[in-house]
Amino acid sequence: ARFFDFSDPLYLRIFGRTLYIAAITTVVSFLIGYPMAFWIASQPEKRRNSLLMMLMLPFWTNFLVRTYAWILILRDQGVINTIWVGHIHNAALWLENTLPWLPLEGFVQVTANPLPLFGTTLAIVIGLVYGWLPDMVLPCYAAIERFDGSLVEAAQDLYANRMQAFIRVIFPLTLPGVIAGSILVFIPSLGAYVTPDLLGGAKSVMIGNVIYSQFMSARDYPFGATISFVLMALMLAGTLFYFRFTVAGQKGEPNHG
């Protein structure tokens, strides 16, 4: 009966939403974390340690405190919307009165209302990226630091420009770090429930919230265990993919997927 309930389209949509949010979180973390790791690795050795310390410093505080900080930033009366509705709206009104020939009426109307940030999927992604970004940066940094810079010089001797050297030499050789960071971000994002509970809304429920409600509110332990098992299987699949990729890379064998 519990597997029949699990086949309900509602839970399938929640699982799909969870995979989507976890994937977006992983991609955004990569787009931010890889350039950050590359920049840190390019700094002098003494400065690298300081930069890594600065990266980790905010994460010495309690996770709930950091999440509540994003509530203060993203809510309708938060920092972003205070600037948006206050300063930017006033600036738009001033420009409209000073330069009436500019088509600013639509922009003035938009800035009159708060941005719908809190209680959305965007808020969840922001919170998750902020929470797991070091897990992307550190593996990428380790892979980039081990990279032999003479290979880039060899590629340039063969008339490769910077972009070609990055695509054909640097990125493939640092890909294990990217894969490791992606797994370290994707797996905890799949099981997240505190961040979507605090930053998300009713339309942004993730599977972690469903598991929590099944155990703590509905007291439906069999169904909660069923969902937990499926989620664990997804996490295990991601972990096995990582190990298969790294072992194939170490043996020098092509990975045929």
Predicted regions: what they are:
Residues 43-51, 79-80, 120, 150, ...:
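Membrane-helix interface segments
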Residues 3-6, 10, 196-244:
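Interhelical loop and adjacent transmembrane-helix boundary motif
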Residues 21-26, 37, 55, 127, ...:
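Alpha-helical transmembrane segments of multi-pass integral membrane proteins
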Residues 141-152, 156, 223-257:
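C-terminal transmembrane helix and the adjacent membrane-cytosol boundary/short C-terminal tail
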Residues 36-73, 152-153, 166-167, 175-176, ...:
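Cytoplasmic-entry segments and transmembrane alpha-helices of multi-pass inner-membrane transporters
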Residues 1, 12, 67-129, 163, ...:
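Membrane-interfacial helix termini and adjacent extracytoplasmic/periplasmic loops
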Residues 9-39, 53-54:
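Transmembrane alpha-helix signature in integral membrane proteins
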Residues 57, 130, 136-150, 160-191:
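Transmembrane alpha-helices
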